[in-house]
Amino acid sequence: MLDRDGFRPNVGIILLNQRNQVFWGKRIRTHSWQFPQGGIDRGETPEQAMFRELHEEVGLLPPQVRVIARTRDWLRYEVPDRFIRRDARGHYKGQKQIWYLLQLLGHDWDLNLRATNHPEFDAWRWNDYWVPLDVVVEFKRGVYEMALTELARFLPRHEQRNRYLRSGMRTREHESSGQASLPRTSSLLVKPGMELPPGASFDPDPQNSVPAPLEALPTLPVPKKPLDA
């Protein structure tokens, strides 16, 4: 479904955790990282499409997230001809998107990349809100920057915990009880029976791990075949 200018209506999702870190998904069988997104079907509202895509790509249901904000207007990007299927060239120009800022209310194990039989991602991670966008395909970077900038003022504010104090208190408690400090295990954070697509990776405690800079992730390869981006 295209508008009169050749743009396909679409939604994009910026998903936050409780630390205001952002979900990044690695497109299946590639080294490309991106936010969840997808087209709006005929008869759908942007919000309905957003919740459908959220479940299809990330496995989350409406009660598991909070809608914080959305962009006021459509954000557009044009897709270069080499990325467009031949039968769509001449009338398909690109995407126009409404972006939503969401916050995860549940747990990391609620995320499920295999909620459908056609997964979009085979790995995921949390990262800081502001990171270089080098791993995003070039023609999408402008829209990512506009969406992140417009929605940044709606980021939830939260008190910074004094992790040093908490750590010190825990150490003294162990010392006073005569017990050695045990390494923290995160195995309980993985939901039993949770499945990922072949070759997927999962950070068992992404809420508490220190994310590596996004620019350290693999760079985006040039697709081998045109795609309807």
Swiss-Prot record:
InterPro entries: Nudix_hydrolase (IPR020476), NUDIX_hydrolase-like_dom_sf (IPR015797), NUDIX_hydrolase_CS (IPR020084), NUDIX_hydrolase_dom (IPR000086), RppH (IPR022927). Residues 6-149 form the Nudix hydrolase domain. Residues 220-229 have a biased composition (Pro residues). Keywords: Hydrolase. Its cofactor is a divalent metal cation. Belongs to the Nudix hydrolase family. RppH subfamily. Residues 168-229 are annotated as: Disordered. HAMAP family: Nudix_RppH (MF_00298). GO terms for molecular function: pyrophosphatase activity. This is RNA pyrophosphohydrolase. PANTHER family: ADP-RIBOSE PYROPHOSPHATASE, DIHYDRONEOPTERIN TRIPHOSPHATE DIPHOSPHATASE. Gene3D superfamilies: Nucleoside Triphosphate Pyrophosphohydrolase.
